[in-house]
Amino acid sequence: MSLLLTIAKEYKRLCQDAKAAQMMTVGTVSNYTTFKKWTTSRKEKNPSLRMRWAMSSKFPIIANKRMLEEAQIPKEHNNVALWEDTEDVSKRDHVLASASCINYWNFCGPCVNNSEVIKEVYKSRFGRLERRKEIMWKELRFTLVDRQRRRVDTQPVEQRLRTGEIKDLQMWTLFEDEAPLASKFILDNYGLVKEMRSKFANKPLNKEVVAHMLEKQFNPESRFLPVFGAIRPERMELIHALGGETWIQEANTAGISNVDQRKNDMRAVCRKVCLAANASIMNAKSKLVEYIKSTSMRIGETERKLEELIPETDDVSPEVTLCKSALGGPLGKTLSFGPMLLKKISGSGVKVKDTVYIQGVRAVQFEYWSEQEEFYGEYKSATALFSRKERSLEWITIGGGINEDRKRLLAMCMIFCRDGDYFKDAPATITMADLTTKLGREIPYQYVMMNWIQKSEDNLEALLYSRGIVETNPGKMGSSMGIDGSKRAIKSLRAVTIQSGKIDMPESKEKIHLELSDNLEAFDSSGRIVATILDLPSDKKVTFQDVSFQHPDLAVLRDEKTAITKGYEALIKRLGTGDNDIPSLIAKKDYLSLYNLPEVKLMAPLIRPNRKGVYSRVARKLVSTQVTTGHYSLHELIKVLPFTYFAPKQGMFEGRFFFSNDSFVEPGVNNNVLSWSKADSSKIYCHGIAIRVPLVVGDEHMDTSLALLEGFSVCENDPRAPMVTGQDLIDVGFGQKVRLFVGQGSVRTFKRTASQRAASSDVNKNVKKIKMSN
């Protein structure tokens, strides 16, 4: 009784407040579900069952009353109650609604065409679908697959950003007022922030969706996956369909809808063949033509020659320009200078020579142009229009781009125009060693300066300071460029202005024909150099999945793992009976020819560069020692032969021979790179792929270890018998024993028994004796 009296008193006290009295007398506060939700903190034991029980009620959800009325959703449809005008006790201006209200909205509500918005939101997923449509599936093979768990990118992106950088970009794009202090990334890439803001402005997207889109646009979604073969993102996103532990599904994964990716692939292939041709000491031009004609790329479902694709592209990058000039194709009035692309707008310069002093002592000549000319320039995200005359950059207007790209574009334009004090006296850190390549070729001074600004940020800013610093006119604040590449600088660089948008490249219908010198310099009919091998950017490690390099010199450009397999396969094919095959060279102890086999040279670029001399010393010693003692295995010799090509060098050997992709072979030990079984000498396994060893001498159709040699019979192995070649058998006397390689890694001892007798006759006689005894 006392408990009920206490509750009644508390109820009377609460009813003194009008709002509390309304909540106590109106609404669903007596509903068990609502009452329990607001009066307990106990964790629900069976939330799924509770949800089903709650949804079975008449009005299990709440909805905004104003939105229901604006959407003209009735309270009842087809005798089914959709909502009622009863205000919910937990949220103001919301009323109770049924699950049928959602169905009515979906099927009878206002129609909205969100197809374009959906494509924009799920752009990465639609892109993946398009790439899958372009795949050309090939044969399915069952074999042991050597997979390694590696961190790989599973989504192609236009620009890769780190996780912290993506979060900064999201905050500065979506929450400008709440964003933290600008990080170095935001300061250097504020142009990207403005681009993203303008991209998503006035679009019917909430901020959570835009944040998702930004993450998908710049995040390559790195994962640790068991992979094999090439690791391009286009391939990694469907690695689960390309192979398992015991099967491989061959497929080409080039993206024909991605124009930028095709252009990058074209540049990468052209850069590789140009650098490979430049490594040739003589006839670099003819080598480049050979490489181009022997290379093909898959475009869509067809494979096309590189020499057909190069004339069709309008790319003016230096690597593509060099390949075009090698083929003699026409080119627009464009030229390259390092990684910067240029197009002349007007003017015609006259070439003049001048002198710069290295370390104040050595005079080095360089060339410049005396007449006024105007150019369009492009570097990454930044573009520019500029004018040069004599040895100066008269003016330049830079459009778009981030601060870092604007700085480097201005520096390259200054070097191109020979502007600044460094074309009178060279920087103190430039020495005479910087003026020549490793092959002893002279490097023009302007390219020496290009290499110099790439070494450090201090060198870049020192060159920009030589342009001259002036006080910024307050009326031009925002249009002048500071030393850091920004617009709002108190002090700016002389005659340098910035505009917000990019500058469009002017069209040029005039075509010119280029010539290519043996030094890989492309020049026009007037002798002006348009592109040179020195313009090529530093080589990058690129894996080619859809490019075929048929020339033997370019085998190393394939996937390194594939190149190693092909190299060992070529060496195993040398286990024949010819004069220049491996067994004959071993029998003659012609080590020099053995170490310089074309197959050995082919694998030389795959060796770890800083250890090649040490590996050569150890490998050569292993080969010579085993051959001299007569106790050797051809399988073991094949394993270490690729490491014998280079000149020997003293050094510490760790017991393993490493390739440049960190795979290795170890003498006397089988591993995934190279392995075999003594029980089956007919196969050698390289990266899980079985390579068949040549069969016996004289009979390619018999899978046996007997040599069918007239006048000889097989006898018990005698290690004291001399090792001879097949051509030397004619000199073997009656009753003498010799050892001869017979195939599949086997060496047998033979004895001269007669002039017209062979091992096959011994086999036939034994078969007859067995039949007679039975």
From Swiss-Prot:
<keyword id="KW-1190">Host gene expression shutoff by virus</keyword>
<dbReference type="GO" id="GO:0075526">
    <property type="term" value="P:cap snatching"/>
</dbReference>
<dbReference type="InterPro" id="IPR049113">
    <property type="entry name" value="PB2_helical"/>
</dbReference>
<dbReference type="InterPro" id="IPR049106">
    <property type="entry name" value="Flu_PB2_N"/>
</dbReference>
<dbReference type="InterPro" id="IPR049111">
    <property type="entry name" value="Flu_PB2_middle"/>
</dbReference>
<keyword id="KW-0507">mRNA processing</keyword>
<dbReference type="Pfam" id="PF20948">
    <property type="entry name" value="Flu_PB2_2nd"/>
</dbReference>
<dbReference type="Pfam" id="PF20950">
    <property type="entry name" value="Flu_PB2_4th"/>
</dbReference>
<dbReference type="InterPro" id="IPR049110">
    <property type="entry name" value="Flu_PB2_2nd"/>
</dbReference>
<dbReference type="Pfam" id="PF20951">
    <property type="entry name" value="Flu_PB2_6th"/>
</dbReference>
<keyword id="KW-0946">Virion</keyword>
<keyword id="KW-1048">Host nucleus</keyword>
<keyword id="KW-0945">Host-virus interaction</keyword>
<keyword id="KW-1262">Eukaryotic host gene expression shutoff by virus</keyword>
<dbReference type="Pfam" id="PF20947">
    <property type="entry name" value="Flu_PB2_1st"/>
</dbReference>
<keyword id="KW-1104">Inhibition of host RNA polymerase II by virus</keyword>
<dbReference type="GO" id="GO:0042025">
    <property type="term" value="C:host cell nucleus"/>
</dbReference>
<dbReference type="Pfam" id="PF20949">
    <property type="entry name" value="Flu_PB2_3rd"/>
</dbReference>
<dbReference type="InterPro" id="IPR049115">
    <property type="entry name" value="Flu_PB2_C"/>
</dbReference>
<dbReference type="InterPro" id="IPR048298">
    <property type="entry name" value="Flu_PB2_CAP-bd"/>
</dbReference>
<keyword id="KW-1191">Eukaryotic host transcription shutoff by virus</keyword>
<protein>
    <recommendedName>
        <fullName>Polymerase basic protein 2</fullName>
    </recommendedName>
</protein>
<dbReference type="InterPro" id="IPR049114">
    <property type="entry name" value="Flu_PB2_6th"/>
</dbReference>
<dbReference type="GO" id="GO:0006370">
    <property type="term" value="P:7-methylguanosine mRNA capping"/>
</dbReference>
<dbReference type="GO" id="GO:0006351">
    <property type="term" value="P:DNA-templated transcription"/>
</dbReference>
<comment type="function">
    <text>Plays an essential role in transcription initiation and cap-stealing mechanism, in which cellular capped pre-mRNAs are used to generate primers for viral transcription. Recognizes and binds a wide range of cap structures of target pre-RNAs which are subsequently cleaved after 10-13 nucleotides by the viral protein PA. Plays a role in the initiation of the viral genome replication and modulates the activity of the ribonucleoprotein (RNP) complex.</text>
</comment>
<comment type="subunit">
    <text>Influenza RNA polymerase is composed of three subunits: PB1, PB2 and PA. Interacts (via N-terminus) with PB1 (via C-terminus). Interacts with nucleoprotein NP (via N-terminus).</text>
</comment>
<dbReference type="InterPro" id="IPR001591">
    <property type="entry name" value="INV_PB2"/>
</dbReference>
<comment type="similarity">
    <text>Belongs to the influenza viruses PB2 family.</text>
</comment>
<dbReference type="GO" id="GO:0039523">
    <property type="term" value="P:symbiont-mediated suppression of host mRNA transcription via inhibition of RNA polymerase II activity"/>
</dbReference>
<keyword id="KW-1157">Cap snatching</keyword>
<keyword id="KW-0506">mRNA capping</keyword>
<dbReference type="GO" id="GO:0044423">
    <property type="term" value="C:virion component"/>
</dbReference>
<dbReference type="Pfam" id="PF00604">
    <property type="entry name" value="Flu_PB2_5th"/>
</dbReference>
<dbReference type="Pfam" id="PF20952">
    <property type="entry name" value="Flu_PB2_7th"/>
</dbReference>
<dbReference type="GO" id="GO:0039694">
    <property type="term" value="P:viral RNA genome replication"/>
</dbReference>
<dbReference type="GO" id="GO:0003723">
    <property type="term" value="F:RNA binding"/>
</dbReference>
<dbReference type="GO" id="GO:0039657">
    <property type="term" value="P:symbiont-mediated suppression of host gene expression"/>
</dbReference>
<dbReference type="GO" id="GO:0003968">
    <property type="term" value="F:RNA-directed RNA polymerase activity"/>
</dbReference>
<keyword id="KW-1195">Viral transcription</keyword>
